[in-house]
């Protein structure tokens, strides 16, 4: 007696002597399934957007910000009323524009008020926008009312900036060892009623951060020596962590980039602080794509910006390949020579050995799936590393003396990466990596043509 599956595939003769298959649905579905699997395309593609880090925890209600008025002496009945009022009443002064009437054209603006307004930048946009506008106006107004030789301009300290970021919900233990501020049991009804009018949390967070970035930029422009080199390095690390928040991945970083560029120019001991800064920034995230996005926070419009982009990219590549301790960054080797040492380690097969330390599952189905997942991770990592390698080269002023080093990089790129990528319709991530390798090779060849020494003829087959 035949099994049901056999019966499904057994032809029967109809009365018209024509052959037909009875109950062949299962057989046809299996056949189509095999056909689909054969020509299926993997959904795992290399995303152009970095995954981001969870830096800020969602916070529905703002933390109370109390004005320290213990040392303030009122100069008018209205100011006395403001200083003695509760927080909701003081906020109404801000919303109604009464604070501008009190302090905008006053001879001296009290520093506790400026500190209070800076803390209010972490509140919902309805309040933070007014706080930023008044903080900006008071700061600018003070510049025109003070003589240049005796000018006093308030800038928040590094600790105050950290506290503001913590009020926004930042919880990173490396930056905030005391832990995030706890939610207060007291919720201000005046602000809670505005929640329905507020933009989405990601947009609201971006608005608040941009207010902070703009004011810090103003501080650095007015007082170039506002912070020591050590404080600048810590502040840049804090800002880079904040910029990698997962909710901000798709939002522009214009204000952050301008602030980072200005902080970079304010470092006194340069290039002595370059390597410590790169080492600190290379540990801001453990994901290679996030670190690539971090490099792109720094614009290449100044010599220092290009130096940092190049050195930071090199340090990140070394860290991802486990070579950060062994690579002689302080030696007299050029960055192209150091990159040449790392490029051979970026071979997909070498990366596969590093990422595939764990044994693959024994069953055939799980082994195939795990192998495909590993192949995707290898191509994803190689794509980020190769992009960083392109940043290193593009940040250099290639001279004829470096022609040989760049020629060697072209050969290594073709030998170790391009020829080791086997494209497949089922693995589009390989195609994207292959495209990047080809584009990088073409750009480097173009650089070779422009910096070719006299009497030299470049041959890609020449053995160096």
Swiss-Prot record:
Organism the protein comes from: Mus musculus
Family: Belongs to the FAM178 family.
Any Pfam family matching the protein: CANIN
Protein name, entry field: Protein FAM178B
InterPro entries found in the cross-reference section: CANIN_dom (IPR044276), FAM178 (IPR026161)
Encoding gene, per UniProt annotation: Fam178b
